[in-house]
Design a protein with these regions (language model features):
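Hydrophobic packing residues within well-ordered alpha-helices of enzyme cores
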Residues: 39, 61, 89, 142-146, ...
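S-adenosyl-L-methionine
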Residues: 1-64, 68-71, 107-109, 185-194, ...
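Proline-aspartate-enriched helix->loop->beta-strand connector
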Residues: 155-158
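Short internal loop-to-helix segment that lines adenine-nucleotide cofactor pockets
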Residues: 3-26, 86-91, 102-153, 164-167
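Conserved S-adenosyl-L-methionine
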Residues: 76-78, 181-190
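Core alpha/beta nucleotide-donor-binding catalytic domains of modification enzymes
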Residues: 58, 62-94
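Short, hinge-like loop/turn segments at secondary-structure boundaries
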Residues: 66-68, 90-96, 150, 169, ...
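Short strand-turn motif at the edge of the Rossmann-like AdoMet-binding core
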Residues: 53-54, 136, 160-163
Length: 249
């Protein structure tokens, strides 16, 4: 953000573009709020539920929300999973040199701490229309705790689907397609060639995701459809025509 003036701008723009009228957006694995807080600012008629399991990141997230007077944001120190309870989550100090964007249940750390686990069904609201999940391979467990929300088929879902966690990606695709959602590939660069500050040295670096659209919601971003759970994400910007508006060819 400091170097390029943006982070995951494409992902944020997509979510904002879907946020017509009013509603609730749930951000699971919100980190320090790089998506949740700009969304809350750009969509003041929406409520944002930001969930973060790491104590330090949660503290920064809450402070950022208050400092920026984003009163339409609720911040929860919790993990999201298949059932309500208590779990052990890595307790890495913010002073450590670590990629906190990759921190999750599978991370190897010397210490853990007990945090509460919630389900999306208990925390989400009736007007939930957008859900973003980025939990480093734990996505299927989060969806197991969202059976009611999934069954209502009202929300648009943006879920991380990386090559580092192919089994989790396959399960996520299978869950959505089994419930009648249309599933698409979505690639979001960390920074784009049209960034406000310095252009990125590696404009292709970014996060792989899937988008699940409920019945009746149009594919307005011309996303590439996922054929099935075993498919690998296509490479190259031509598979993601929406990237052209950000300087990709």
């Amino acid at each position: 953000m400091r170097r390029h003036g943006e982070f995951a701008r494409v992902e944020l723009d997509f979510l904002v573009d879907q946020a017509t009228g009013s509603g609730t957006m749930v951000d699971v694995g919100a980190n320090i709020g790089a998506i949740a807080l700009p969304f809350a600012r750009r969509c003041p008629d929406w409520t944002v539920l930001a969930i973060e399991a790491h104590r330090g990141l949660h503290g920064l997230l809450a402070a950022n929300a208050v400092t920026n007077r984003l009163h339409n944001t609720e911040v929860h120190h919790a993990a999201a999973g298949a059932e309500r309870g208590l779990v052990e989550f890595p307790a890495l100090s913010l002073a450590e040199h670590f990629n906190f964007g990759a921190l999750g249940f599978g991370s190897t750390t010397s210490h853990t701490e007990t945090v509460r686990m919630l389900t999306l069904d208990e925390i989400s609201r009736d007007d939930t229309r957008l859900v973003k999940i980025d939990v480093e391979g734990f996505e299927p467990q989060v969806l197991k705790g969202a059976t009611g929300l999934l069954a209502r088929r009202r929300a648009i879902w943006l879920v991380e689907a990386t090559i580092q966690n192919p089994e989790a990606t396959s399960q996520v695709i299978s869950i959505f397609q089994g419930l009648g959602y249309a599933v698409f590939w979505f690639y979001a660069p960390f920074a784009t060639p049209r960034s406000e500050k310095d252009p990125p040295l590696e404009p292709g670096a970014g996060d792989s995701n899937i988008v699940a659209l409920p019945p009746g919601v149009a594919n307005t971003w011309q996303l590439t459809a996922v054929s099935g759970p075993g498919e690998r994400r296509p490479n190259g910007s031509t598979a993601y025509p929406y990237l052209a508006r950000y300087g990709y060819s």
